[in-house]
Amino acid sequence: MTADDWLPVGKVVAVQGLKGELRVNPASDFPERFTEPGSRWLKARGQAPREIELTSGRQLPGKSVFVVRFAGVESRDAAEALVGQTLMVPADDRPELAEGEFHLLDLVGLEARLSADGDAIGTVKDLISGGNDLLVLERPDGRTLMIPFVEAIVPDVHLEQGWLRLTPPPGLLEL
């Protein structure tokens, strides 16, 4: 499988406790990827993804972080070896969406405009997931901006046409 055959859904960011549990920062809007048992894949930098069985998971109350347990990872030492790896699923394992919905990673590559007939003011290069999702926007001059992905600032997404509309507050584009 090539890199395009995989979809990153989270990053292992820390160990939780002494019995092999791990904290995962999600890059997916589908919590079942972290709570429903089944096959997942872990990818270390410079290596191919390797299959691992998710046995359980839960979201920490009031946080966007999940605590997961993988088969065969029974100690803190075993868990620490997985910190920094990316949790993956096959790219064709995307949940069905309702009309008007989209997968956040589909925003990468879209042009950002201030109006439907306006010129592109940048291109979405990445997405940072956390408490609030951020679009990483590359300007034509090479500068990079972080744009909060909230409806007030990104009211329209036109995947089929390859662009999204921004309504930034004063000063956001000058940062």
UniProtKB/Swiss-Prot annotation:
<keyword id="KW-0963">Cytoplasm</keyword>
<keyword id="KW-0690">Ribosome biogenesis</keyword>
<comment type="similarity">
    <text>Belongs to the RimM family.</text>
</comment>
<dbReference type="GO" id="GO:0005737">
    <property type="term" value="C:cytoplasm"/>
</dbReference>
<dbReference type="InterPro" id="IPR011033">
    <property type="entry name" value="PRC_barrel-like_sf"/>
</dbReference>
<dbReference type="InterPro" id="IPR009000">
    <property type="entry name" value="Transl_B-barrel_sf"/>
</dbReference>
<dbReference type="InterPro" id="IPR011961">
    <property type="entry name" value="RimM"/>
</dbReference>
<dbReference type="GO" id="GO:0005840">
    <property type="term" value="C:ribosome"/>
</dbReference>
<dbReference type="Pfam" id="PF01782">
    <property type="entry name" value="RimM"/>
</dbReference>
<dbReference type="GO" id="GO:0043022">
    <property type="term" value="F:ribosome binding"/>
</dbReference>
<dbReference type="GO" id="GO:0042274">
    <property type="term" value="P:ribosomal small subunit biogenesis"/>
</dbReference>
<keyword id="KW-0143">Chaperone</keyword>
<comment type="function">
    <text>An accessory protein needed during the final step in the assembly of 30S ribosomal subunit, possibly for assembly of the head region. Essential for efficient processing of 16S rRNA. May be needed both before and after RbfA during the maturation of 16S rRNA. It has affinity for free ribosomal 30S subunits but not for 70S ribosomes.</text>
</comment>
<dbReference type="InterPro" id="IPR056792">
    <property type="entry name" value="PRC_RimM"/>
</dbReference>
<feature type="domain" description="PRC barrel">
    <location>
        <begin position="99"/>
        <end position="172"/>
    </location>
</feature>
<dbReference type="InterPro" id="IPR002676">
    <property type="entry name" value="RimM_N"/>
</dbReference>
<dbReference type="GO" id="GO:0006364">
    <property type="term" value="P:rRNA processing"/>
</dbReference>
<protein>
    <recommendedName>
        <fullName>Ribosome maturation factor RimM</fullName>
    </recommendedName>
</protein>
<keyword id="KW-0698">rRNA processing</keyword>
<dbReference type="Pfam" id="PF24986">
    <property type="entry name" value="PRC_RimM"/>
</dbReference>
<comment type="subunit">
    <text>Binds ribosomal protein uS19.</text>
</comment>
<dbReference type="InterPro" id="IPR036976">
    <property type="entry name" value="RimM_N_sf"/>
</dbReference>
